[in-house]
């Protein structure tokens, strides 16, 4: 996207606008309030500091190593806490083996939230790391074939394939901001971006301007191209979320969609959105990766996402508990360092 334009607005909200120099597309529009919360949330959470983030390889390695070390520290702390508790269990099963205040509260918060701290650090590591091969079910050769086949199907079409003149589409509305020549499995269409919406127009017709959407026959053809005629599968129209197709309240996946259940070793499910022209694929490897990352990191679990209030309660409880656990750990670390410095000076 570089270079880009950055505009500063002289208004009370101190808006800032980022826009691409190539096509004028808006990348980001912020105000002082959103930037303030970004510095309290996303920036420290993802280590989005400009001096580091502009070096992508270094940033990825830093986050991976930090998350890995965090996993080891959390696991070691939980293990040592359990050991100390077991040695002092004669004091009572529900009593801390420590008497000093900071040690006691660090122990209690570690018992309650230590496991979640480990899974949070581990899932953060998984966000930038591929699943190890021993956890994957699909062979590498099959993954490469699937990727290369999809690239050939969605490759660029010749201009002649777009029978409908784009100027005819432009004449239908004054709100059109951009037209993109697109295709889905060799079927041409125009992606029309308006003020706040995106529409797909069938470009195979030379006369009428009509929406482009996926049909059942197009989906059947796509499934046969992917799996051949020897693999059995069935298709239905999904109007409610299932165990594989769902999302959080603000990121709910669109409905209805066509669901294809494939009878293969990977228990593959395909979800086709006929209006937005998109396909989602989920198999055993995808389910494992989703659990290891979004499931553990943001509680992206259907039982909780279907109950937003419960999701908020659980998430805020874990975040507050994890923050307190980290705070007590930092205090104890600072106290230990000060003791070492004082001892060294003597």
Positions of the model-derived regions?
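Conserved histidines in hydrophobic membrane contexts and catalytic metal-binding motifs
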Residues: 1-346
